[in-house]
């Protein structure tokens, strides 16, 4: 505990808040180019092949970003938009790729939460479109 004299000599410093997404540099999204698109396995106890991409951003950072949704069209040199948001079971993945922008296609046949996956509203006649084989 400092004395009054010590506080007069040097006031208390304001603690700086550490950002959870430094590569965005206080922007909501950033554009980047995929340098590698691959799958990786999550931490225990989960098991899957999660789709991720290594992205070189316009801010100069190179980060690992998660590709959400079922299926994707990304490959090396694809131009993507990323946002903040980590994936809890993938260590080091602190960003998400935004579906439906730039070179990233939206998720096909998505009916719910479409805005999160870049899917356009289906035409009224196509509502019950191919969901699988009918018997």
UniProtKB/Swiss-Prot annotation:
- Cross-referenced HAMAP family, in alphabetical order? Ribosomal_uS12_B
Q: Which UniProt keywords apply?
A: Methylation, Ribonucleoprotein, Ribosomal protein, RNA-binding, rRNA-binding, tRNA-binding
Name the Gene3D superfamilies on file.
Nucleic acid-binding proteins
Q: What does this protein do?
A: With S4 and S5 plays an important role in translational accuracy.
Question: What would be one Pfam family of this protein?
Answer: Ribosom_S12_S23
Q: What is this protein called?
A: Small ribosomal subunit protein uS12
Q: Name one GO biological process term.
A: translation
